[in-house]
Amino acid sequence: FLPIIASVAAKVFPKIFCAISKKC
């Protein structure tokens, strides 16, 4: 497991969750 993947996921996941939950 790479720290780079973790950092990218930390940036991408909130945007995906925001789009799904419509809580921006």
Swiss-Prot record:
Membrane-crossing segments per the record: none
Subcellular location: Secreted
Keyword Transcription on entry: no
UniProt keyword annotations, A-Z: Amphibian defense peptide, Antibiotic, Antimicrobial, Disulfide bond, Fungicide, Secreted
GO cellular-component term (any): extracellular region
Tissue and organ distribution: Expressed by the skin glands.
Pfam families: Antimicrobial_1 (PF08018)
Disulphide connectivity of cysteines: C18-C24
InterPro entries to which the protein is assigned, alphabetical: Antimicrobial_frog_1
Biological process (GO), any one: defense response to bacterium
Function, in words: Antibacterial activity against Gram-positive bacterium S.aureus and Gram-negative bacterium E.coli. Has activity against C.albicans.
Family: Belongs to the frog skin active peptide (FSAP) family. Brevinin subfamily.
Protein name per its UniProtKB record: Brevinin-1Pe
